Amino acid sequence: MARSIIAVLPAAGVGSRMQADKPKQYLTLLGKTLLEHTLDVMLSYPAVSKIILAVSKDDPYISTLSLDPKIQLVEGGTTRAESVLNGLNVIAEKNAWVLVHDAARPCLQHADIDKLLAIEDKQGAILAIPVTDTIKRADNQQCIVKTEDRSQLWQAMTPQFFPVDILRDALSTGIQQGANITDEASAIELAGFRPHLVAGRSDNLKVTRPEDLALAEFYLTRNKL
């Protein structure tokens, strides 16, 4: 049976580090919100059959957007893990795999999705890039304790790609155990799996701080040329 590919975008966060007057996914670049740019990437990828968008219950902005019929809204949770799980819980398709992607990563390119979808191992896979900067471990006073060996360190990105049933079980268990789930792979790891690392592009940045906006605008402009 051919697997179906569904995208889940958790978009219920407030993005406090952006210091903006609205959640960062609703900031505007090149005439569209960050969220719309990100949705466009998934909507234009032929293999994605549906997009599930998890938004805050009292989100005042989502109703102002013109959403494609392929997009299904679900109520987000208080954490990323809960929002993603809420999205997974409405998926009824058999043999479905899910691409979980940050709403504030608008510069994703289809070639990187291609590489993820080439993975058929049920351990799953995530986009990531090898760490190139020197990494320091700090103490509580923000002083350097040691320099870490970066030779086997990777920076996790999204999309992260897993069978729906495996990710659903892993997130449910992790949440029940009170685990620190910072991305989907961390829940999968706790369940005993070893997801593949797929080398992605460094321009697939997550807009987190004000200075990221100009860089995202540059990449989006370049990608449209």
UniProtKB/Swiss-Prot annotation:
It catalyses: 2-C-methyl-D-erythritol 4-phosphate + CTP + H(+) = 4-CDP-2-C-methyl-D-erythritol + diphosphate. The record marks R150, K206 as: Positions MEP for the nucleophilic attack. The record marks R17, K24 as: Transition state stabilizer. SUPFAM superfamilies: Nucleotide-diphospho-sugar transferases. GO terms for molecular function: 2-C-methyl-D-erythritol 4-phosphate cytidylyltransferase activity. Its EC number is 2.7.7.60. Pfam families: IspD (PF01128). InterPro entries: IspD, IspD/TarI, IspD/TarI_cytidylyltransf_bact, ISPD_synthase_CS, Nucleotide-diphossugar_trans. Signal peptide: none annotated. One of its GO terms (biological process) is isopentenyl diphosphate biosynthetic process, methylerythritol 4-phosphate pathway. Pathway: Isoprenoid biosynthesis; isopentenyl diphosphate biosynthesis via DXP pathway; isopentenyl diphosphate from 1-deoxy-D-xylulose 5-phosphate: step 2/6. Keywords: Isoprene biosynthesis, Nucleotidyltransferase, Transferase. Belongs to the IspD/TarI cytidylyltransferase family. IspD subfamily. NCBIfam families: ispD. Catalyzes the formation of 4-diphosphocytidyl-2-C-methyl-D-erythritol from CTP and 2-C-methyl-D-erythritol 4-phosphate (MEP). This is 2-C-methyl-D-erythritol 4-phosphate cytidylyltransferase. It comes from Haemophilus influenzae (strain PittEE). The gene is ispD.
